[in-house]
């Protein structure tokens, strides 16, 4: 398999994984802590030696690969809401990489969170709130806001709001990596089969 395509598909699985977690949280108000940690940790890996360093939890990433099969394959299980969130994330990522000040502030704020992790777990409410504020302060204002659908009772809870924003930041991080690896929106239309085949093979590794 083409190494670049493998890495690009891994990053795309990372985007979908984080988006699906946003959807689950918005509907149910709860998310497995290990899954949350796997996505949030990707934000902090800013200088990886390889793509696999960003996604060490292969079990969680498998869900992202399965979402690729559902969203890009011949499956009838395509989720319109996931597609809507994906379009929003990719649009915000484009705005971010064109904003030198945004990228600089992002790096600085991520360093602050890294220092926090000497004392707290990444899923600690204070850390999650700080990641959420990075999204609100730097990303959210770059373009149209992503409208999250779900259970109104869940969406009113501050901790759920914080986790959703932190996960959107994780999705943006994977989108930046996907683009750095040569990912383009047109690939999602014209190179779907290659992406789906790579996801299938990655699931069996």
UniProtKB/Swiss-Prot annotation:
Record-linked InterPro entries: HflD (IPR007451), HflD-like_sf (IPR035932)
Disulfide bonds listed in the record: none
Subcellular location(s) per record: Cytoplasm; Cell inner membrane
Keywords: Cell inner membrane, Cell membrane, Cytoplasm, Membrane
SUPFAM superfamilies, alphabetized: YcfC-like
A GO CC term assigned to this protein in UniProt: cytoplasm
Membrane topology: Peripheral membrane protein
A Pfam family recorded for this sequence: DUF489
Family stated for the protein in its record: Belongs to the HflD family.
Protein's name according to its UniProt entry: High frequency lysogenization protein HflD homolog
Organism: Shewanella sp. (strain W3-18-1)
Gene it is expressed from: hflD
């Amino acid at each position: 398999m083409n190494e670049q395509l493998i890495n690009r598909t891994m990053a795309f699985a990372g985007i979908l994984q984080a988006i699906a977690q946003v959807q689950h949280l918005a509907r149910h108000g709860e998310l497995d802590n290990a899954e949350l940690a796997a996505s949030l940790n990707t934000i902090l890996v800013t200088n990886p030696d390889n793509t696999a360093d960003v996604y060490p939890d292969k079990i969680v990433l498998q869900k992202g690969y399965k979402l690729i099969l559902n969203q890009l394959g011949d499956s009838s299980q395509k989720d319109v809401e996931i597609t809507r969130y994906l379009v929003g994330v990719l649009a915000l990522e484009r705005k971010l990489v064109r904003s030198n000040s945004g990228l600089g502030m992002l790096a600085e704020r991520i360093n602050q969170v890294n220092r926090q992790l000497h004392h707290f777990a990444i899923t600690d409410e204070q850390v999650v709130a700080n990641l959420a504020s990075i999204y609100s302060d730097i990303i959210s204002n770059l373009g149209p806001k992503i409208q999250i659908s779900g259970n109104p009772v869940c969406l009113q809870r501050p901790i759920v709001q914080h986790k959703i924003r932190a996960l959107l930041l994780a999705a943006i991080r994977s989108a930046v990596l996907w683009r750095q690896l040569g990912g383009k929106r047109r690939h999602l239309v014209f190179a779907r089969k290659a992406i789906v085949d790579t996801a299938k093979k990655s699931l069996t590794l």
